[in-house]
């Protein structure tokens, strides 16, 4: 029944004024930004790394580059226009969390675009313009309207929210509950031949 689940990506920035700094990793940035020790920042990110590992993800915060995400969000909206947003997001997350790539760098975004089959000449023109900036800003505005203050943040069927790095079971339970309720409210929609 997972065919009835639609994933919608939305843009959000924790630190919209953050300057990209390829010489600084995310542990260093977090320590400075939160006013905590580097050791404490590493502990916090190690917790997230361990949660990610439980679901088969590899996070390398020691090499994750401090990068403003606005251009990456514009790239994601461009990819959405061509039906490639899921692939774009997966590649962006891998580039940032695993591969230590600068996701604010146009060349990095062009490489990802090429990997997922986007027209890189059109993508380059988009990234060198302000195209999709309004889409990103609209998503951020919507997030503020519903009370988003951190990432990750997930909304299920516009009813249930899961915030922060949570155990996989929290997502499973929320997804199952929201889908069961949706199915009950939409009898005949999920499977028109079954009533």
PLM regions: where:
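C-terminal cap of thioredoxin/glutaredoxin-like
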Residues: 1-3, 9, 76-195
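Structural alpha/beta surface segment adjacent to cysteine/selenocysteine redox centers
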Residues: 1-96, 192
């Amino acid at each position: 029944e997972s065919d009835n689940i639609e994933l919608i990506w939305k843009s959000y920035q924790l630190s919209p004024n953050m300057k990209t700094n390829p010489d600084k990793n995310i542990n260093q940035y977090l320590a400075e930004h939160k006013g905590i020790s580097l050791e404490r920042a590493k502990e916090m990110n190690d917790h997230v790394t361990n949660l990610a590992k439980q679901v088969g993800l590899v996070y390398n915060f020691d090499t994750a580059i401090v990068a403003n995400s606005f251009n990456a969000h514009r790239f994601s909206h461009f990819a959405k226009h061509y039906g490639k947003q899921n692939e774009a997001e997966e590649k962006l997350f891998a580039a940032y969390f695993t591969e230590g790539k600068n996701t604010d760098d146009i060349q990095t975004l062009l490489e990802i675009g090429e990997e997922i089959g986007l027209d890189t000449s059109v993508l380059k023109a988009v990234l060198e313009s302000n195209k999709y900036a309004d889409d990103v800003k609209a998503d951020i505005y919507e997030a503020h309207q519903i009370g988003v203050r951190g990432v990750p943040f997930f909304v299920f069927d516009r009813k249930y929210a899961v915030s922060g790095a949570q155990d996989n079971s929290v997502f499973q339970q929320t997804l199952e509950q929201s889908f069961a309720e949706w199915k009950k409210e939409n009898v005949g929609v999920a499977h028109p031949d079954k009533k």
